[in-house]
């Protein structure tokens, strides 16, 4: 019973956090945009991002954002209707050159700089726009899971880095092979990487909106 009460309280806290994220994101816009696209062409999307809370802050908060152009999204192979089992996803943005220069000063955007791409240069640069692609993917890494003497579990990579200040490491009573998946993200043009980082989470943060599947 105590665990049941704890689960209820945890559920209430999580629901409150989700409502807060939805409120500060104006998530209804993202939901409506995805739903409208699904109604018109049978498919829509919205996304989850982490963004700085202010220009002078290093703190991040979670936001729900719309993806107005369904055709700008490619979600990797998946079975679940919401795409939650996909292992990669792409979002394509044909960004006006002036906007690109403002957001990425010093990055290559002149038409002749794309000549080295050969016949593909027209895809990446039209003279008025630069194609910017965001890629999310889950990178799998083999691991070993330790069961410790106190009953807790710990990955070998963390166990090996046990800090001396924490005292003696607990004894290992059992181990088994396992794996972890790291969510990675990169934003790039056809010439260079604009930004990249590892992200928290175990899902591709692109949510697919579909109608009835038969």
What is each stretch, according to the model?
Residues 1-214:
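Extended alpha-helical, oligomerization-prone segments that build pores/tubes and scaffolds
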């Amino acid at each position: 019973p105590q665990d049941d009460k704890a689960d209820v309280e945890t559920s209430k806290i999580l629901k409150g956090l989700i409502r807060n994220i939805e409120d500060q994101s104006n998530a209804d816009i993202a939901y409506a945009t995805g739903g409208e696209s699904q109604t018109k062409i049978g498919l829509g999307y919205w996304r989850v991002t982490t963004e700085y809370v202010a220009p002078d802050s290093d703190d991040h908060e979670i936001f729900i954002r719309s993806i107005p152009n369904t055709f700008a999204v490619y979600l990797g192979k998946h079975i679940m209707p919401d795409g939650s089992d996909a292992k990669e996803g792409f979002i394509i943005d044909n960004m006006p050159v002036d906007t690109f220069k403002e957001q990425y000063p010093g990055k290559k955007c002149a038409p002749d700089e794309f000549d080295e791409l050969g016949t593909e240069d027209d895809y990446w640069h039209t003279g008025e726009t630069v194609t910017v692609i965001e890629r999310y993917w889950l990178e799998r890494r083999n691991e070993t899971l330790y069961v410790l003497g106190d009953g807790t579990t710990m990955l070998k990579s963390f166990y090996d880095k046990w800090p001396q200040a924490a005292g003696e490491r607990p004894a290992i009573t059992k181990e088994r092979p396992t794996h972890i998946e790291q969510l990675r993200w990169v934003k790039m043009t056809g010439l260079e990487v604009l930004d990249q980082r590892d992200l928290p989470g175990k899902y591709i943060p692109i949510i697919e909106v579909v109608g009835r599947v038969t």
